[in-house]
A protein has these predicted regions:
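Cys-dependent protein tyrosine phosphatase-like superfamily
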Residues: 1-110, 123-170
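Glycine-rich nucleophile elbow surrounding the catalytic serine of serine-hydrolase chemistry
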Residues: 117-123
Length: 170
């Protein structure tokens, strides 16, 4: 592979964190969100995601807006919206097995939301406990807080608790 210049490699998305090194990561929406969203930054961050080999990128944002930009830059994506009114148990029962399948098939997965907040962090903690990577909810919460460098709030903790009620991963 040819050596590429710094700008050809793109820029790392804001709040990018590895959950499992070179396997699963999370970040803020490429380009930022709200008043901080920038089109050029979005493009540079999607280029970085592509250059790192992520496939697919899973967006949990309610709207599919801007996902077409990933298509234009050759990045495979999945839209799995997680709204404020979503039943957490139903959502996790569908999302977690799909994520496990992608990881088992050796896909390098990036999950993003509007921000690296309770929803993304809670999904991480949920996966850790549901998949059996962490033996208990408190251990999953503690590891998630270390991995994301943020404290889990009520929504994130509830997601982990709900994951404990689901049938365990096969």
């Amino acid at each position: 592979m040819a050596v590429k210049g710094k700008w050809a490699q793109g820029i790392e998305p804001r709040n990018f964190r590895w959950v499992m090194k070179d396997v699963l990561a999370v970040c803020e929406r490429p380009g930022g969100y709200g008043a901080n969203h920038r089109r050029v930054r979005r493009q540079e961050e999607i280029i970085w995601v592509r250059e790192q080999g992520f496939s697919p990128v899973i967006s949990i944002i309610a709207s599919p807006a801007n996902l077409h930009n990933s298509d234009e830059l050759g990045v495979t994506w999945l839209h799995r919206p997680f709204s404020n009114h979503e039943d957490m148990g139903v959502y996790l029962a569908q999302f977690l097995p799909e994520l496990k399948g992608l990881l088992a098939a050796r896909h390098k997965v990036l999950i993003h939301g509007e921000e690296l907040g309770d929803r993304i962090s809670g999904i991480v903690g949920s996966y850790l406990v549901w998949s059996g990577l962490m033996p208990t909810g408190p251990k999953a919460i503690s590891l998630t807080e270390q991995l994301t460098a943020r404290q889990l709030g009520p929504v994130g903790r509830e997601l982990v608790a709900v994951a404990l009620t689901l049938p365990p991963a096969p």
